[in-house]
UniProtKB/Swiss-Prot annotation:
It comes from Haemophilus influenzae (strain 86-028NP). HAMAP family: UPF0246. One of its GO terms (cellular component) is cytosol. InterPro entries: YaaA. It comes from the Bacteria. Belongs to the UPF0246 family. This is UPF0246 protein NTHI1156. One of its GO terms (biological process) is response to hydroperoxide.
Length: 258
Protein backbone atom coordinates (compact mmCIF):
# COMPACT_ATOMS: atom_id res chain seq x y z
CA UNK A 1 0.00 0.00 0.00
CA UNK A 2 1.38 3.37 -1.07
CA UNK A 3 0.09 6.75 0.13
CA UNK A 4 0.75 10.04 -1.65
CA UNK A 5 0.39 13.50 -0.13
CA UNK A 6 0.94 17.10 -1.17
CA UNK A 7 3.86 19.19 0.07
CA UNK A 8 3.38 22.35 2.16
CA UNK A 9 4.17 26.02 1.69
CA UNK A 10 5.27 26.31 5.32
CA UNK A 11 8.80 24.97 5.83
CA UNK A 12 11.01 24.25 8.84
CA UNK A 13 14.75 24.32 8.28
CA UNK A 14 15.60 25.42 11.81
CA UNK A 15 14.56 22.83 14.38
CA UNK A 16 16.67 19.79 15.17
CA UNK A 17 16.08 16.60 13.17
CA UNK A 18 16.74 13.08 14.38
CA UNK A 19 19.68 11.30 12.81
CA UNK A 20 18.35 9.25 9.90
CA UNK A 21 20.07 8.01 6.75
CA UNK A 22 19.30 10.53 4.00
CA UNK A 23 19.14 10.29 0.23
CA UNK A 24 19.51 12.45 -2.84
CA UNK A 25 16.21 13.42 -4.50
CA UNK A 26 15.71 11.40 -7.67
CA UNK A 27 14.83 14.11 -10.18
CA UNK A 28 17.42 16.84 -9.59
CA UNK A 29 18.15 17.06 -13.33
CA UNK A 30 14.54 18.15 -13.80
CA UNK A 31 14.63 20.40 -10.74
CA UNK A 32 17.70 22.15 -12.11
CA UNK A 33 15.84 22.96 -15.34
CA UNK A 34 13.02 24.57 -13.35
CA UNK A 35 15.46 26.50 -11.19
CA UNK A 36 17.08 27.94 -14.33
CA UNK A 37 13.66 29.19 -15.47
CA UNK A 38 12.86 30.62 -12.04
CA UNK A 39 16.19 32.44 -11.79
CA UNK A 40 15.17 34.59 -14.74
CA UNK A 41 12.19 35.96 -12.81
CA UNK A 42 12.37 39.25 -10.93
CA UNK A 43 10.77 39.61 -7.49
CA UNK A 44 7.92 41.46 -9.21
CA UNK A 45 7.49 38.62 -11.71
CA UNK A 46 7.41 36.08 -8.91
CA UNK A 47 4.97 38.11 -6.83
CA UNK A 48 2.56 38.28 -9.77
CA UNK A 49 3.04 34.64 -10.83
CA UNK A 50 2.53 33.18 -7.37
CA UNK A 51 0.19 35.84 -5.93
CA UNK A 52 2.52 36.41 -2.98
CA UNK A 53 3.79 39.48 -1.14
CA UNK A 54 6.90 41.38 -2.21
CA UNK A 55 8.64 40.10 0.92
CA UNK A 56 7.88 36.46 0.10
CA UNK A 57 8.85 37.03 -3.52
CA UNK A 58 12.23 38.40 -2.42
CA UNK A 59 12.76 35.41 -0.13
CA UNK A 60 12.05 32.95 -2.92
CA UNK A 61 14.20 34.77 -5.47
CA UNK A 62 17.02 34.32 -2.95
CA UNK A 63 16.13 30.65 -2.50
CA UNK A 64 16.26 30.04 -6.25
CA UNK A 65 19.63 31.81 -6.43
CA UNK A 66 21.06 29.68 -3.61
CA UNK A 67 19.64 26.35 -4.79
CA UNK A 68 22.25 23.82 -5.83
CA UNK A 69 21.98 20.40 -7.42
CA UNK A 70 24.23 18.97 -4.72
CA UNK A 71 22.14 18.23 -1.64
CA UNK A 72 23.80 17.68 1.71
CA UNK A 73 22.93 18.04 5.37
CA UNK A 74 24.29 21.58 5.41
CA UNK A 75 21.93 22.98 2.75
CA UNK A 76 19.03 20.49 2.94
CA UNK A 77 16.91 18.40 5.22
CA UNK A 78 14.74 15.27 4.79
CA UNK A 79 11.45 16.17 3.14
CA UNK A 80 9.35 14.50 5.84
CA UNK A 81 10.76 16.92 8.41
CA UNK A 82 10.96 20.01 6.19
CA UNK A 83 7.26 20.46 5.39
CA UNK A 84 5.13 21.96 8.18
CA UNK A 85 1.65 22.71 6.80
CA UNK A 86 -1.73 21.41 8.00
CA UNK A 87 -1.24 17.92 6.54
CA UNK A 88 2.08 17.63 8.35
CA UNK A 89 0.55 18.82 11.61
CA UNK A 90 -1.69 15.76 11.43
CA UNK A 91 1.17 13.49 10.40
CA UNK A 92 3.41 14.84 13.21
CA UNK A 93 6.62 13.31 11.84
CA UNK A 94 8.73 14.44 14.80
CA UNK A 95 6.92 12.00 17.08
CA UNK A 96 7.22 8.98 14.75
CA UNK A 97 9.57 6.21 15.84
CA UNK A 98 12.62 5.20 13.82
CA UNK A 99 10.77 2.08 12.65
CA UNK A 100 7.80 4.24 11.62
CA UNK A 101 10.03 6.46 9.48
CA UNK A 102 11.69 3.44 7.87
CA UNK A 103 8.23 2.06 7.02
CA UNK A 104 7.20 5.46 5.64
CA UNK A 105 10.26 5.50 3.39
CA UNK A 106 8.75 2.57 1.47
CA UNK A 107 5.06 3.44 1.77
CA UNK A 108 4.78 7.23 1.51
CA UNK A 109 5.56 9.69 -1.29
CA UNK A 110 5.28 13.48 -1.41
CA UNK A 111 4.39 15.22 -4.65
CA UNK A 112 6.36 18.39 -5.39
CA UNK A 113 6.32 21.12 -8.01
CA UNK A 114 10.12 21.39 -7.92
CA UNK A 115 11.20 17.85 -7.07
CA UNK A 116 8.45 15.84 -8.75
CA UNK A 117 8.20 13.03 -6.23
CA UNK A 118 10.00 12.75 -2.90
CA UNK A 119 10.55 9.91 -0.47
CA UNK A 120 10.37 10.90 3.21
CA UNK A 121 14.16 10.79 3.70
CA UNK A 122 15.04 12.46 0.40
CA UNK A 123 16.89 15.70 1.00
CA UNK A 124 15.33 18.95 -0.20
CA UNK A 125 16.32 22.59 -0.12
CA UNK A 126 13.87 25.38 0.80
CA UNK A 127 11.68 26.45 -2.11
CA UNK A 128 8.22 27.57 -3.08
CA UNK A 129 6.84 26.30 -6.37
CA UNK A 130 3.31 25.01 -6.23
CA UNK A 131 2.24 22.44 -8.80
CA UNK A 132 -0.54 24.69 -10.12
CA UNK A 133 1.86 27.53 -10.91
CA UNK A 134 1.54 28.63 -14.54
CA UNK A 135 5.30 28.74 -15.04
CA UNK A 136 6.14 28.75 -18.75
CA UNK A 137 9.04 26.38 -19.40
CA UNK A 138 10.74 24.61 -22.33
CA UNK A 139 8.16 21.79 -22.15
CA UNK A 140 5.00 23.86 -22.02
CA UNK A 141 2.88 26.46 -20.26
CA UNK A 142 2.85 25.00 -16.75
CA UNK A 143 4.32 22.41 -14.40
CA UNK A 144 1.88 19.71 -15.49
CA UNK A 145 3.33 19.99 -18.99
CA UNK A 146 6.86 20.07 -17.58
CA UNK A 147 6.53 16.88 -15.56
CA UNK A 148 4.54 15.04 -18.24
CA UNK A 149 4.59 11.31 -17.46
CA UNK A 150 7.62 11.46 -15.15
CA UNK A 151 5.71 11.62 -11.86
CA UNK A 152 3.16 9.03 -13.00
CA UNK A 153 5.89 6.55 -13.91
CA UNK A 154 7.66 7.11 -10.58
CA UNK A 155 4.42 6.57 -8.67
CA UNK A 156 3.80 3.35 -10.61
CA UNK A 157 7.28 2.08 -9.76
CA UNK A 158 6.61 2.76 -6.09
CA UNK A 159 3.24 0.98 -6.33
CA UNK A 160 4.86 -2.01 -8.03
CA UNK A 161 7.33 -2.29 -5.16
CA UNK A 162 4.43 -2.72 -2.72
CA UNK A 163 3.19 -5.93 -4.28
CA UNK A 164 -0.52 -5.20 -3.74
CA UNK A 165 -1.22 -2.52 -6.38
CA UNK A 166 -2.99 -0.17 -3.95
CA UNK A 167 -2.60 3.62 -4.00
CA UNK A 168 -4.13 5.77 -1.27
CA UNK A 169 -4.62 9.27 -2.67
CA UNK A 170 -4.29 11.77 0.16
CA UNK A 171 -3.06 14.58 -2.07
CA UNK A 172 -4.94 17.75 -3.02
CA UNK A 173 -6.55 17.94 -6.45
CA UNK A 174 -3.90 20.47 -7.54
CA UNK A 175 -1.12 17.99 -6.91
CA UNK A 176 -2.92 14.78 -7.83
CA UNK A 177 -3.51 16.25 -11.28
CA UNK A 178 0.22 15.67 -11.91
CA UNK A 179 -0.47 11.93 -11.66
CA UNK A 180 -2.16 10.51 -14.76
CA UNK A 181 -4.55 8.17 -13.05
CA UNK A 182 -5.64 6.43 -16.25
CA UNK A 183 -2.05 5.28 -16.81
CA UNK A 184 -1.70 3.65 -13.40
CA UNK A 185 -2.05 -0.07 -12.83
CA UNK A 186 -3.48 0.17 -9.34
CA UNK A 187 -6.60 0.19 -7.22
CA UNK A 188 -6.88 3.81 -6.12
CA UNK A 189 -8.58 4.67 -2.85
CA UNK A 190 -9.50 8.28 -2.13
CA UNK A 191 -10.36 9.01 1.52
CA UNK A 192 -12.76 11.95 1.95
CA UNK A 193 -13.11 13.70 5.30
CA UNK A 194 -16.38 15.44 6.17
CA UNK A 195 -17.11 17.49 9.26
CA UNK A 196 -20.58 18.17 10.61
CA UNK A 197 -21.02 21.87 11.01
CA UNK A 198 -24.43 23.47 11.47
CA UNK A 199 -26.11 20.14 10.84
CA UNK A 200 -24.45 19.39 7.51
CA UNK A 201 -21.46 17.20 6.68
CA UNK A 202 -19.04 18.90 4.32
CA UNK A 203 -15.36 19.21 3.51
CA UNK A 204 -13.76 21.95 5.62
CA UNK A 205 -10.33 22.56 4.12
CA UNK A 206 -8.32 23.08 7.32
CA UNK A 207 -9.78 19.99 8.99
CA UNK A 208 -9.56 17.87 5.83
CA UNK A 209 -5.87 18.67 5.35
CA UNK A 210 -5.06 17.74 8.93
CA UNK A 211 -7.12 14.55 8.56
CA UNK A 212 -5.08 13.52 5.51
CA UNK A 213 -1.99 13.75 7.68
CA UNK A 214 -3.69 11.77 10.44
CA UNK A 215 -4.57 9.07 7.91
CA UNK A 216 -0.91 8.92 6.82
CA UNK A 217 0.14 8.58 10.44
CA UNK A 218 -2.42 5.82 10.98
CA UNK A 219 -1.26 3.94 7.90
CA UNK A 220 2.39 4.21 8.96
CA UNK A 221 2.05 3.42 12.65
CA UNK A 222 -0.27 0.46 12.07
CA UNK A 223 1.75 -0.88 9.11
CA UNK A 224 -1.40 -1.18 7.00
CA UNK A 225 -1.28 -3.75 4.23
CA UNK A 226 -4.98 -4.23 3.45
CA UNK A 227 -7.61 -1.83 2.10
CA UNK A 228 -10.16 -2.94 4.69
CA UNK A 229 -7.83 -1.79 7.47
CA UNK A 230 -8.22 1.81 6.25
CA UNK A 231 -11.87 1.69 7.25
CA UNK A 232 -10.84 1.28 10.90
CA UNK A 233 -9.28 4.77 10.92
CA UNK A 234 -10.58 6.65 13.95
CA UNK A 235 -7.98 9.30 14.77
CA UNK A 236 -9.23 12.80 15.53
CA UNK A 237 -12.76 11.56 16.15
CA UNK A 238 -13.47 10.45 12.56
CA UNK A 239 -15.48 7.34 11.75
CA UNK A 240 -15.99 5.40 8.53
CA UNK A 241 -19.41 5.89 6.94
CA UNK A 242 -20.07 2.84 4.81
CA UNK A 243 -23.40 4.21 3.54
CA UNK A 244 -21.73 7.25 1.96
CA UNK A 245 -18.67 5.38 0.68
CA UNK A 246 -18.02 3.58 -2.59
CA UNK A 247 -15.51 0.91 -3.55
CA UNK A 248 -12.88 3.57 -4.28
CA UNK A 249 -14.01 6.58 -2.21
CA UNK A 250 -13.89 6.04 1.54
CA UNK A 251 -15.91 8.65 3.44
CA UNK A 252 -15.03 9.49 7.02
CA UNK A 253 -17.23 11.77 9.10
CA UNK A 254 -16.82 13.71 12.31
CA UNK A 255 -19.02 15.87 14.50
CA UNK A 256 -17.43 19.15 15.54
CA UNK A 257 -18.16 20.23 19.07
CA UNK A 258 -19.18 23.87 18.95
Amino acid sequence: MLAIISPAKTLDFESAVKNFPVFQPHFTDYSEQLIEVCRKLSPQDLSSLMSISDKLAGLNVARFAEWTKIHNEDNSRPALFAFKGDVYTGLDADSLSEDDVIFAQSHLRMLSGLYGLLKPLDLMQPYRLEMGTKLANPKGKDLYAFWGNVITQAVQQAIDAQGDNVLVNLASDEYYKSVKENQLNAKIIKPVFLDNKNGKYKVISFYAKKARGLMCRYLIQNRLTDIEQLKEFDLGGYWFDSASSTETEFVFKRDINE
